[in-house]
Amino acid sequence: SYQIKNPMIDITEKSAAVADKEGNDILVFQEDGLKGEVHTTMPIEKVSVSEQGIVSAILKSDTAMKVICYDTAGNILVEHKTSLAGSGYPVDVALSANGQMMQVLYLYTQDGRIEGRLHYYNFGDAGKDKTDHQVTKKNYKNTIMASGFFMDENTSAAIGDNAMVIYTGKDIPKQNVK
């Protein structure tokens, strides 16, 4: 049995991740039952799961924020440390179905102005020579980007308080519609 006090879930066609919001446990399920368990070192804010069961999570504490990808055994695949002064506060995370592309939405503030930031990280060949695997970065002034998701392998979207953007491109996403 599992003790999940504040459950949140992300579902794909073949996998599901159940996480304890503000807790430290993520359970990954597939058709044949429990596929894996992840125990985090910091409280969980958001999760996203790929078809294979790779999990991406936004973790936060009072002093630090991280975006980490785990395999189904709980091993860390990728770890991005974030800061308010750097990329901003991570608001949402989404993984492509194959787990190769990660979309992260950040909220950044400076001198009383807000900016939504949308970053894409490619863990395949397209991102292997890039710093932190980052292949696309776009800033949206006076916009809070709140929710992002992949529609298919080639298309993703982000929704903000005054904008909706659609990106296309399997390896290096480019803004297609605003």
Each model region followed by its residue ranges:
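Structural motif
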Residues: 24-28, 63-69, 110-122, 161-169
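Repeated scaffold domains used in trafficking and secretory/extracellular systems
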Residues: 2-13, 42-53, 86-95, 137-153, ...
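Short loop/turn segments that connect beta-strands within beta-propeller blades
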Residues: 29-33, 70-75, 123-126, 169-172
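A short beta-strand motif characteristic of beta-propeller blades
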Residues: 1, 32-39, 76-83, 128-139, ...
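Post-signal peptide N-terminal segment of secreted/secretory-pathway proteins
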Residues: 1-42
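Hydrophobic beta-strand positions that form the internal "hydrophobic ladder"
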Residues: 16, 54-56, 99-102, 156
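Eukaryotic tandem repeat interaction scaffolds
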Residues: 152-178
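Residue-level marker for isolated small/hydroxyl-bearing positions within beta-strands
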Residues: 19, 57-60, 104-107, 158-160
